[in-house]
Every structure is written in C-alpha cells, then in structure tokens.
Swiss-Prot record:
This is Acyl-coenzyme A synthetase ACSM3, mitochondrial. ATP binds at residues 229-237, 368-373, 455, 470, 566. GO terms for biological process: acyl-CoA metabolic process; fatty acid biosynthetic process. Its EC number is 6.2.1.2, 6.2.1.17. Residues 1-21 form a transit peptide. Belongs to the ATP-dependent AMP-binding enzyme family. Gene3D superfamilies: 3.30.300.30, N-terminal domain of ligase-like. The gene is Acsm3. The lineage of its organism: Eukaryota, Metazoa, Chordata, Craniata, Vertebrata. It is found in: Mitochondrion; Mitochondrion matrix. Its main location: mitochondrion. The keyword Nucleotide-binding applies. The modification N6-succinyllysine is found at residues 67, 100. One of its GO terms (molecular function) is fatty acid ligase activity. It comes from the Eukaryota. It comes from Rattus norvegicus.
Length: 580
C-alpha cells in the first residue's frame, strides 16, 4: 500500500480475524496490533517524510484499498441522530465529498494554503468534511466548541486571524455581531437548510461543487491546526500542530492504545471543539482504516449512550470518566453489548471504583490514557498489559517519559515530581510545535532536555505512572478544561463582586466542578445570599461558555494572598479537597 511505503510509519496492513465477523460476542484482551508492551516499545520506529498530508497519504490510500477489495465492506464514516437518520460513507465517498468542500474553500472563499479556518459545528457530518477539506487545501483548521459565547468567538477570531468561519444557525447571529471587529475575516459558511444574508450556504454549494481537486503537497512540519486551550493566567492559548505531529503522531493512539484494525467501529463521545476529537474521531481510527462512528446527541444522555452501544456494532468506545460514572448508575446488565470489546478513557483521572463497577457490569476493562492538547498519547494502559486501577499506565511508544524535580533531575521511582517528555537531542514527532504568538509561554515549558507537561505525578517500581495533581490550576470537569481566569473575568463583571478566586471542588459525578470564592462589595453583603448565588451563576452562563459557570459559590471576607498580592489558589483548593 503506497501510504505505508511513503510514510514508513505503519506496519503491514492487519487483516481482520474472521471470527470477529462470524461471532459478534467475540472479545479478547489480546492485542491485535502488537505482541506485548515491551516489544511494542522496543520495536516502534518512524521516519518522518519531508512531505506528508493525511488526506492524500492515508485517506486516499484507503480509498485505493477499498477499490482493490482488500478492505472489508465497513463504512469509513457512520453517523446517526436521535430521530433515526443515518449517514454512511465509504472512504471513496468521503474523498469525493471532501474534495467538493475543498473546492468551496479555495474557489468560493478564495482561501490559500496557510489561511486559517475556524470551524464551530456540532457532531454533524459536515464537521468531518471540514476537517478533511482543510487538510486537502493546506488551510489551518481551528476547531471551537458550540458552547462558545459571542465574546469567546470574538476573541478567537481576532487572536487567530481567521479568514473564514464555518458554523450553523445557532451561532451565526453571534458571528454577525462581532464580524465587523474581525479585520481578517472575509468568508462565512453556514450549515443550514435556510439562506442567511452575507453567508455562503454550504449545503447548497456542495450540490454544485466539483469533486475534482488536487490535494496540496504539504510539508510534514507545516502548521495543520490550532487548538485553543484554557490556562491559569490570561485568556486561552493557541496550540499549534503540524501535519506530522497529529497526522502521523496519532498513529500511536490508533494502533496501540485503541488497538484498531480496519474492521473496527470506533465511537468517541468527545465534543468537536476539543483536541480529543482529533485523537479519536479523526486521525486515530482513519489511520487504521477503521470506521468512525458518531451519534449526534444535543446533550449527554446515559440511556441513549447505552442503547447506542447495544444497537450498533461498535467495537471500541472512548469517553470521559464523567460519562462512565453516569453510565454505571444505570442498570447496565439489561443491555447486551455484543460487539463491544475495548473501552478507553481520557481527559481526567478515572476512579478505580468506576473501573471496578464497569468491569463487574460489562465484563470489560477501561484502559485509561493520558495526554494533552499539546501531545498525542503520553502514557496509557495497553491491551495485554496488567491494569493497575488509578494508574495512567506506561509511556506510549512515541515518548520517553520521566519524573523531574525543579532542577531538571530525573527522580527515582516513588518520588513525586513534574511529568516530563524528553525533547532533546531528538524532538518527538507527536508533540506540538509552539504556542502560537506566545514565545515566552513556549519557552517556559522547557527544562533542560525536557518538555514539562504541567502535571505532577510519580512512577512506581514497575514503571507505571501515577497522576497526582495539576501543577497549574486548570479545572477538569466532565472532560472540559476550564481556566480560572476565564471564570474570574466573567465574575468580576457582576456588580456585586469585589474580587474572586476560582478552584476545583470534588464532585461524585463530574470528578470536579468549578467553585468560586467571592468577596462581595459592601452594598451587597445584606442581600439574600442564596438568591445572589443564583444570579451570579446565571450571569456567568451568559457571559462565557455555560459549562464554565461555578456550580459552587462561597462568600468570604477576604482572599488568601501572598506578600506580592497573588491569590493563593493552592490554599483554597487544598482546603476544599480536604474538608469536602
């Protein structure tokens, strides 16, 4: 297969075991793509080609494999909604539709290689087409969650210098309000059944677009995508990934952690605005020729998730720990998952108790993985490996992972320190390039020969890594990364608030939630405090993305601060996690 030869990173195409087709309840913890962890880590090597484009070198090669009959009749993409509607594409159909989309970007929108395209769409087929169209045209994809507010959209359009935005009816009005303030924005595409003034209607344009398009020959180190991520100070930062860092780097996830082959059907529940969707809804499964399954749910519903797992031949399932916590509260034993054989979790640490309950009710282990928007899989629990509940597992083949002290010294097993990835003398291919337009932040992540993840942990005597805490104050709630600065910025706009500090607080379902410690202005200290809490919560929901609002609020007289005036969030968080 040409893609395998050119990229020199994928092993021989795995032919599915026919037992998995004949017997729907076939399950095994034996890896499909490797013999054991040690051999996988030892044997893994990759040469990065000078030119690489995932659409041309992977997707189009799977199309060729389909045409020659070497890939079983498994869809490349399978989408369903709650109303019984389904969309199925082969790799050939995906290619044809994405080439039409690519022509719209280059011809109707006049976009050129390197131009930036913001895509804010829910889990609808056009989101996947937008991903592939950007690859084909060499334009830079910038995903955004559909929960963004007008203020969020303005900041992202301005800071990214996006020339085009693609969204739907829900967010188009917000875009229209801020568009005049975005000097680089000149094209707007809407996915809608209706026309809108000043917008190109993508559905109509697709009807007449040509599917003849020549894929841009991108260099492996060209910028492919920018992901916004929350931090503790300042607004969200832009993380740059290249055609190789995700396009090739995520082969590690697909082949080893997800253990996918071409007959698999992979369902990842992540929001389209996050890098996890690139991980498990685009690059990882399609690298392996597997089917990407998507279910459009307006909101998370555990019953719908279980029904979907039971109804469709999903073999690999990926979701956040919050989802598993909610799923096990149902009577899972009343469902039959005849095809499901592999379950993974990422985004935040998963409780051992949840893993135990899931195994008890389904017979399946949950294989936890650890990574960041900046990386591909850093550590993981892999099939064929002993699972230590609560552990992140062992380093993926992509990285050399160590625990460092503040001086950059590698610590022995059992000692807590900073989780770090070696980047010198040879920089790993699955790592981001830089924080866009933020060289000081990029430089701050380096310590000697290592990239510092910002997370604390330790390694045990068996080489398993254990997560302890985040070095920064980012809150992980239901799989969302929430920066305290964003919430505090919204809070301070309320007239009752003099100052505030936001930290994480434990929650049995979401893992952790946002808690705000608030110092009130004198005029509001006699107000009904419960009513005021509700008003503040509603204010935050309207000011920033709704998932960021503080589910817990505590009014205090003053915030603990250092001598230099910095809020001591660590003290507040420690108190919260100790006393709650």
């Amino acid at each position: 297969m040409a893609m395998l030869l050119r990229a020199r990173c994928f092993h021989r195409l795995a032919i599915p075991d026919p037992r998995r087709i004949l017997y729907k309840d076939y399950r095994t913890a034996i890896p499909q793509n490797f013999s054991n962890y040690e051999s996988m880590k030892h044997d893994f090597k990759i040469e990065i080609p000078e030119y690489f484009n995932f659409a041309k070198d992977v997707l189009d090669q799977w199309t060729n494999t389909e045409k020659t009959g070497k890939r079983l009749s498994n869809p490349a993409f399978w989408w369903v909604d709650g109303n019984g509607k389904e969309v199925r594409w082969s790799f050939e159909e995906l290619g044809s539709l994405s080439r039409k989309f690519a022509n719209i970007l280059t011809e109707a929108c006049s976009l050129q290689r390197g131009d930036r395209v913001m895509v804010i769409l829910p889990k609808i087929p056009e989101w996947w087409l937008a991903n592939v169209a950007c690859l084909r045209t060499g334009t830079v994809l910038i995903p955004g969650t559909t929960q963004l507010t007008q203020k969020d959209i303005l900041y992202r359009l301005q800071s990214s210098k996006s020339k085009c935005i693609i969204t739907d009816d829900t967010l188009a009005p917000a875009v229209d309000i801020v568009a005049a303030k975005c000097e680089n924005l000149h094209s707007k595409l809407i996915v809608s059944q209706h026309s809108r003034e000043g917008w190109g209607n993508l559905k109509e344009m697709m009807k007449y677009a040509s599917d003849s398009h020549t894929c841009v020959d991108t260099k492996h180190n060209e910028l492919m995508a920018i992901y916004f991520t929350s931090g503790t100070t300042g607004p969200p930062k832009m993380i740059g990934h290249t055609h190789s860092s995700f396009g090739l780097g995520l082969s590690v996830n697909g082949r080893f952690w997800l253990d996918l082959i071409a007959s698999d059907v992979m369902w990842n529940t992540s929001d389209t605005g996050w890098a996890k969707s690139a991980w498990s809804s685009v690059f990882s499964p399609w690298t392996q020729g597997a089917c990407v399954f998507a279910h459009y749910l307006p909101r998370f519903d555990s019953t719908s998730i279980l029904q979907t797992l039971s109804k469709f031949p999903i073999t690999v399932f990926c979701s956040a720990p919050t989802a598993y916590r909610m799923l096990i509260q149902n009577d899972i034993t009343s469902y039959k998952f005849n095809s499901l054989k592999h379950c993974v979790s990422a985004g935040e640490p998963i409780n051992p108790e949840v893993m135990e309950q899931w195994k008890k009710k389904t017979g399946l282990d949950i294989y936890e993985g650890y990574g960041q928007t900046e990386t591909v899989l850093i550590c993981g629990n892999f099939k064929g490996m002993k699972i230590k509940p609560g552990s992140m597992g062992k380093p993926s083949p992509a990285f050399n992972v160590e625990i460092l002290d503040e001086n950059g010294t590698i610590l022995p097993p059992g000692q807590e320190g900073d989780i770090a990835v070696q980047v010198l003398p040879d920089r790993p291919f699955g790592l981001f390039t830089h924080y866009v337009d933020n060289p000081s932040k990029t430089a701050s992540t380096l310590r000697g020969n290592f990239y510092i993840t910002g997370d604390r942990g330790y390694m045990d005597e068996d080489g398993y890594f254990w997560f302890v805490a985040r070095s920064d104050d980012v809150i992980l709630s239901s799989g969302y990364r929430i920066g305290p600065f964003e919430v505090e910025s919204a809070l301070i706009e309320h007239p009752s608030i003099a100052e505030s500090a936001v930290v994480s607080s434990p929650d049995p379902i979401r893992g952790e939630v946002v808690k705000a410690f608030i110092v009130l202005n004198p005029d509001y200290k006699l107000h009904d405090q419960e009513q005021l809490k509700k008003e503040i919560q509603e204010h935050v929901k309207k000011t920033t993305a709704p998932y960021k609002y503080p589910r817990k609020i505590e009014f205090i007289e003053e915030l603990p601060k250092t001598v230099s005036g910095k809020v001591k969030r660590n003290e507040l968080r420690r108190k919260e996690w100790t006393t709650t």
